[in-house]
Amino acid sequence: MKKELLAPAGDTEAGYAALYYGADAVYLGLKHFSARATAANFGADDLNEFVGYAHSLGRKVYVAVNTLLQEDELPELLKALDLCAKYKVDALIVQDLGVARVVREAYPELELHASTQMAVHNREGALALQKIGFSRVVLARELTLNEIREIAAIPGLETEAFIHGALCYSYSGLCMFSSLETGKSANRGKCLYPCRAAFGGCDGEKHYFSMKDMALQGEVLKMPVTSLKIEGRKKTALYVAAAVDYYRRILDGRGDDAERAENIRQIFSRPWTKFHFNGRNKDVIDRDFVGHRGLKIGRTGSLRNNSLQFRTTHKIARYDGIQIDVPGEEKPFGFSLQSLRVNGRNVFEAQAGETVEVKLPPHAPRLEKGWDIYLASASEVKGAYPYEKPKPGAFRQRRQLDVSVMIEKGKLSAATGEFFFAVTGEFAKAENPDKTADAVRKAFGKTGDTDFVLGNLTIENPQGLFAPASLLNELRRGLYGQVVFEEEPRVLPAVKKVRESGAPKWIVKTDKVETLAGINLE
C-alpha cells in the first residue's frame, strides 16, 4: 500500500515548498478555528489558489478546523465551512463533535478526519468515530507500533500517524496546562507552551516537561497507516522543504540520507527521539535546554586570546551560527562565525575532521573544555532547498459562465442564466462573419478579476453582421457587471429536545474496574 506523505503549511510559502519536494497532501488552517492560531494561516484567496494548484498536481489539501467552539461562533464556522466546500478541499480535520455534526448534516460532501486532539489511542475509540461518519482518525502520538497496527487493521477506516516534529507532554486535546496557567487554551489554538519553561525540583531548576522532538526516520517503513504526518504548521518553508525531502526519499526507497537528516537538525531541532514507537520509552525529556539545538559538531577545546579551538565533525563556514551548551544556563550560548582559521590561516570554510579556531564575541561567557558545540544554522543549507510556486492568480478556482450572444439589426444582446444586457447601434454587413465571431470570443474571454471564466459561448449572427470591438466590450462589461452567484444556503436541522422521565440516574466515572464492584447497578 502506497503511504501518503502529509506535510504542514502554516502559510502559502510552506505549502508550495511541501508540494515541490514531494508531499502527497498538505494540511493547513484558516484564520479561525485552527489549533495553531498564531501561525500565519490561510485567507480565502490563499485557500482558493492553493487548493487549485495542489489539485492540478494531483495532490490533496486538508483543512484543520480543530479547536473547540463556543456556541456564538457558529455563524463564523459556517462561513469557514462554506469556503472549504466552495474550493473543494479534500477533508476537514476536526476535534469538536459539534463541528463534526454540522459537517455531516450541512456539508456531507466534505470528508471528516478525526484530529489527534481527540486522543484516539485504541481500537474502540477509532470504531466509535467511524460509526459517526469519520473516514480517518489521526492517532495519538503516544502509541507503540503494535498499538498502531491494531487500530490500522479496522476495515474501511483510514489511519494517520505523526512521524516527525514536536511532542506534547500531555495527550494532545486533553492538556489544560496552558489554559490553567495562562488563560490561553490549547483547545482554542492559543497554547503558550508553559511545559517548555523551567521549574524547581529535586535537581534544581530544570525543564522537567520539555519534550524532545519525534523523528521516526527509517522506522516509517514499518507503519501500516494510510498517511504519515509531519508536524510543523509554525515552522518555516525551509524546514518543511527539508523534512518533506528527507522522508520522501525514504518512502521512495532511496534510503535514509544522513546528510539530509543533518540539514533538518541545522534548520530546527531539539534532540530527537523515537518516543514510544518501539515500546514505552522514558528518555523523552530534554531537561537542560529548551528550543533549537542544531547538529552536534564537536566539543570546546583550548581557549586563548578570546578565541576557541575545536575539532569539527562537520563542514562549517564563515557566518554559520553555532551554539555551545553552557551548564547551568537555560539556553545555549550562540554566535555567528565572523572569522574562521585553520592551521593559522584565515579560511572561508573548514572541512569535517579539521581543527578550527574561531573568534569569540565580546559578550561570550566563560567557557571550559569539553562542552558540546552545535551547528545551529548554515548558509549552505539555507540555500539548499529552492522551490517553485505559481504566478499569483494562475490557479485561482473560478466558475464557468456559459454565455449566449445575439447580433441582429440595430441591437447586440448577451445573456447568461437570469442576467441579460443589450446595446443598440447600426451594424453593417460583415465582409468575413468568422472574424466577427472571433471578435466576440475575444471580448467575452476577458473576465478580469471576477469569480468566473468563460465557459460555453453561443453566437447567433443570422444576417452575418459586423460588430465593432468597442460595442462588444461594452456589451461584455454590462453583462458581467450584473453577474452575482447566489450560494445555496446550508440549513442545519433543528436539534430535537430529549425528554427523560423516571428516577434520577447516577453517572460514575472511573479508571478502575474494581470500583464498580461496590456499586449496585440493578
Q: Predicted segments — roles?
A:
Residues A39-N48:
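Aromatic- and glycine-enriched glycan-recognition loops and surfaces
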Residues A119:
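Beta/alpha (TIM)-barrel catalytic core signal, keyed to glycine-rich beta->alpha loops juxtaposed to Asp/Glu
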Residues G98-V99:
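Alpha-helix capping/helix-boundary segments
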Residues V103:
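RNase H-like DDE/DDD metal-dependent nuclease/strand-transfer catalytic core used by mobile genetic elements
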Residues M1-Y21, A25-A35, F50-V51, L57-T67, ...:
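Surface-exposed amphipathic alpha-helical tracts and adjacent flexible/coil segments at the periphery
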